[in-house]
Amino acid sequence: MSASADSLAAAASLDKYGDEDIFSLLIRYGLYVGALFQFVCISAAVLMENNPDSQSNPETGEVTEREGEPVRTRLHKIRKLEKKKRR
């Protein structure tokens, strides 16, 4: 029993920082809160369903049907505009 008490005293004497101050506690719990916030944001982005009523942005690369214009012509126009932008 005295050997364990002596080893605890020796371990306590090696601890050069002692008790944690308020700043280290603030940093530790702030990191936990930040990790929780990131987890919530990522899970919301993954699990959130798309709203079917929302209008899609035409610049996202999705091709939608237009009246009287075949799909092949639209794809050609999109590729041509992208090539022109790269110049």
Swiss-Prot record:
InterPro entries in UniProt: UPF0239
Gene Ontology cellular component terms for the protein in this record: membrane
Pfam families to which the protein is assigned, alphabetical: UPF0239
Regions that span the bilayer: 25-47
Domain of life: Eukaryota
Membrane topology summary: Single-pass membrane protein
Family named by the database record: Belongs to the UPF0239 family.
Main localisation: membrane
Organism in which the protein naturally occurs: Drosophila simulans
Keywords: Membrane, Transmembrane, Transmembrane helix
Disordered: annotated span: 50-87
Protein name: Protein anon-73B1
PANTHER family: MANNOSIDASE, BETA A, LYSOSOMAL-LIKE, MANBAL PROTEIN, PROTEIN MANBAL
Residue spans of biased composition, Basic and acidic residues class: 63-72
